[in-house]
C-alpha cells in the first residue's frame, strides 16, 4: 500500500511538472512561445512534420535541412499568408533558417498576378514573405545568394534581420515598406540593390553600403527619412533615378568615387539642400557641382584616397583616432576618421 501511494505521488508530481512546463511554453491564447525546432530529412516534408492544427500556434520556429516550394507554402501560412496571399491565422514572429537550405522543386508557394512562384537553389524567391505582417525577426540561410522582388514587402514590424555573407543581389522592392527596420549590415559581397528595394524604410537610421556594391536602383532608398548619413563608396558605377528621394533626415553624404558614377535624375529631391553637406574627393568639386549633387548648397572637398571601411588585422590595435582637422577623437565619429595602429600603420576610416 505504501509503495502504491509513493508511486502515485511520484506520478502526480511528474504530471504537475509537465503541466507547468506546458503552461510556460504556451500563453493564454494557446500560442507556443518557446522555439520549436524541426529537422527535415528531405525537402517537401514540412507539411507532414507540422500538422495543420499546430501551424497557427507556433510563434518561434527553427528549420534545419533542405526546404522547397512545398515547405515554403507552410512557412508562409504560418507567417500569416496563404497560397493566394490572403490572410491566415498564423502567428509566426521569429524564424531561424540559418541551418536551412532553399532548393528547387516542390509545389509553387505563391500565386499572384496570374503567376506561380517556385523556389530555386539558394534564392529567397519573389513574394517569399509578402505582407507577412507579424514577422519580427528572421535569420536567413547561410548559403543564400539573392533576395527576390518584394520578398519582404509590407513586413512593417520586421525589426531584426540577419543577411548572409554570400548575398550578392537584392531585388526590386525587396524591403518595400519595412518601416520597422532600424539598422542592419549589408554583406561585403553585395553588388546590386534593385529599384525601390528599401522604399519607405523610414525607421532606418544608419546603413553601411559595402565596397563591392556597383549599382543602386531607382528609388532604392526613397523616403528613408530616418537616414542621417550616407557613404557612397568608390566601386559604385550607377545610381538610379530618385535613389534617395525624400531622405529628409540626411545631414552628410560622403562620396569616395573620383570617377563619378552614372547618375539618374531627381536623386535627392525632398532632401534638405541647406542642412546636408556633401563631401567629395579632392579635385572633383567641379564635376560634382555640375551633376545631380548640385541640389545641395554645401559641397566640400576632402582627401578620400586610401579609405578603409573595415579593418581586418587581427594583431594591430588602435592607439589613437583623429578627425581630418587633426582633432583627437575619443570614439568613432561620423565622417572620415584617421586611425593610428600599434603596428605603425595609419588608416583613413569612413564612419557612418
Per-range role (PLM):
Residues 1-11:
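Bacterial N-terminal signal peptides that target proteins for export
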Residues 125-128, 148-153, 171-176, 194-199, ...:
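Consensus positions within tandem repeat domains that build extended binding/scaffold surfaces
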Residues 301-325:
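Residue-level detector of functionally pivotal "anchor" positions at catalytic/ligand-binding pockets or at interdomain
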Residues 31-41, 59-67, 87-122, 133-146, ...:
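Structural signature of tandem-repeat unit edges
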Residues 6, 336-352:
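C-terminal tail/sorting-segment detector
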Residues 9-20:
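Bacterial N-terminal signal peptides
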Residues 323-343:
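Short, surface-exposed loop/turn motifs with a glycine/proline- and acidic-biased composition
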Residues 61, 288, 306-310, 326, ...:
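Terminal processing/anchoring signals of secreted or surface-associated proteins
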Amino acid at each position: 500500500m505504501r509503495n502504491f501511494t509513493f508511486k502515485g505521488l511520484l506520478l502526480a508530481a511528474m504530471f504537475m511538472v509537465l503541466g507547468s512546463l506546458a503552461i510556460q511554453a504556451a500563453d493564454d491564447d494557446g500560442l507556443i512561445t518557446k522555439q520549436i525546432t524541426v529537422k527535415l530529412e528531405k525537402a517537401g516534408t514540412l507539411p507532414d512534420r507540422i500538422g495543420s492544427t499546430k501551424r497557427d500556434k507556433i510563434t518561434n520556429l527553427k528549420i534545419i535541412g533542405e526546404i522547397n516550394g512545398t515547405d515554403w507554402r507552410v512557412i508562409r501560412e504560418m507567417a500569416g499568408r496563404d497560397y493566394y496571399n490572403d490572410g491566415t491565422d498564423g502567428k509566426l514572429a521569429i524564424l531561424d533558417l540559418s541551418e536551412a537550405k532553399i532548393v528547387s522543386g516542390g509545389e509553387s508557394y505563391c500565386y499572384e498576378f496570374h503567376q506561380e512562384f517556385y523556389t530555386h537553389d539558394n534564392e529567397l524567391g519573389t513574394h517569399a514573405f509578402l505582407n507577412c505582417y507579424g514577422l519580427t525577426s528572421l535569420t536567413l540561410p547561410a548559403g543564400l545568394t539573392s533576395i527576390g522582388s518584394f520578398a519582404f514587402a509590407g513586413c512593417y514590424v520586421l525589426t531584426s534581420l540577419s543577411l548572409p555573407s554570400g548575398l550578392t543581389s537584392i531585388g526590386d522592392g525587396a524591403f518595400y515598406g519595412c518601416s520597422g527596420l532600424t539598422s542592419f549590415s549589408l554583406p561585403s559581397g553585395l553588388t546590386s540593390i534593385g529599384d525601390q528595394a528599401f522604399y519607405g524604410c523610414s525607421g532606418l537610421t544608419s546603413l553601411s553600403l559595402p565596397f563591392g556594391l556597383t549599382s543602386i536602383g531607382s528609388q532604392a532608398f526613397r523616403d528613408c527619412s530616418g537616414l542621417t548619413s550616407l557613404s557612397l563608396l568608390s566601386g559604385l558605377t550607377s545610381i538610379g533615378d530618385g535613389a534617395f528621394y525624400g531622405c529628409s533626415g540626411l545631414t552628410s553624404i560622403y562620396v569616395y568615387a573620383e570617377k563619378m558614377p552614372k547618375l539618374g535624375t531627381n536623386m535627392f529631391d525632398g532632401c534638405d539642400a541647406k542642412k546636408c553637406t556633401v563631401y567629395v574627393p579632392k579635385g572633383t568639386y567641379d564635376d560634382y557641382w555640375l551633376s545631380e549633387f548640385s541640389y545641395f548648397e554645401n559641397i566640400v572637398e576632402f582627401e578620400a584616397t586610401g579609405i578603409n571601411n573595415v579593418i581586418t588585422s587581427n594583431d594591430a590595435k588602435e592607439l589613437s583616432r583623429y578627425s581630418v582637422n587633426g582633432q583627437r577623437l575619443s570614439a568613432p565619429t561620423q565622417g572620415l576618421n584617421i586611425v593610428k595602429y600599434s603596428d605603425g600603420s595609419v588608416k583613413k576610416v569612413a564612419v557612418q
